[in-house]
Amino acid sequence: MKALSPVRGCYEAVCCLSERSLAIARGRGKSPSAEEPLSLLDDMNHCYSRLRELVPGVPRGTQLSQVEILQRVIDYILDLQVVLAEPAPGPPDGPHLPIQTAELTPELVISKDKRSFCH
């Protein structure tokens, strides 16, 4: 059996500690699992602010809770569904009358002499 040198054992321990301290320094002292909820919270806050911007009728200067924002989003979606469910308006029922020459301004009326230049 080989005897382990106590100096070598300490060196390995120091290397291990220095690797951990580098990892902590790179991560600013937070483990990746601790950073995840904060980034998710930022994402959710961004989503709520984006929803607030997209829904019409939300006053800009007032504070709304997340529940109020979601309720306004739901109301807006329901309003859109009602509008889309309505039948589309058709063309007017009356006959389409062509524009008479008398209804045009004199600048728009081309005399018969000038019409020959067009064709």
Curated annotation (Swiss-Prot):
GO cellular component terms attached to this protein's record: cytoplasm; nucleus
CDD domains linked: bHLH_dnHLH_ID3 (cd19693)
InterPro entries for the chain: bHLH_dom (IPR011598), DNA-bd_prot-inh (IPR026052), HLH_DNA-bd_sf (IPR036638)
Principal subcellular localization: nucleus
A Pfam family it matches: HLH
Matching Gene3D superfamilies: Helix-loop-helix DNA-binding domain
Modification after translation (UniProt): Phosphorylated in vitro by CDC2 and PKC.
Entry keywords, A to Z: Biological rhythms, Myogenesis, Nucleus, Phosphoprotein, Repressor, Transcription, Transcription regulation
Superkingdom classification of source: Eukaryota
GO biological process: cellular response to leptomycin B; central nervous system development; circadian rhythm; epithelial cell differentiation; heart development; metanephros development; muscle organ development; negative regulation of cell differentiation
GO molecular function, one term: bHLH transcription factor binding
Coiled coil start-end: none
Localization of this protein: Nucleus
Domain bHLH: 28-80
Record note on quaternary structure: Homodimer, and heterodimer with other HLH proteins. Interacts with COPS5 and COPS7A. Interacts with IFI204. Interacts with GATA4 and NKX2-5. Interacts with ANKRD2; both proteins cooperate in myoblast differentiation. Interacts with CLOCK and BMAL1.
Role summary: Transcriptional regulator (lacking a basic DNA binding domain) which negatively regulates the basic helix-loop-helix (bHLH) transcription factors by forming heterodimers and inhibiting their DNA binding and transcriptional activity. Implicated in regulating a variety of cellular processes, including cellular growth, senescence, differentiation, apoptosis, angiogenesis, and neoplastic transformation. Involved in myogenesis by inhibiting skeletal muscle and cardiac myocyte differentiation and promoting muscle precursor cells proliferation.
Entry protein name: DNA-binding protein inhibitor ID-3
Organism: Rattus norvegicus (Rat)
Biological classification of the source: Eukaryota, Metazoa, Chordata, Craniata, Vertebrata
Gene this protein is translated from: Id3
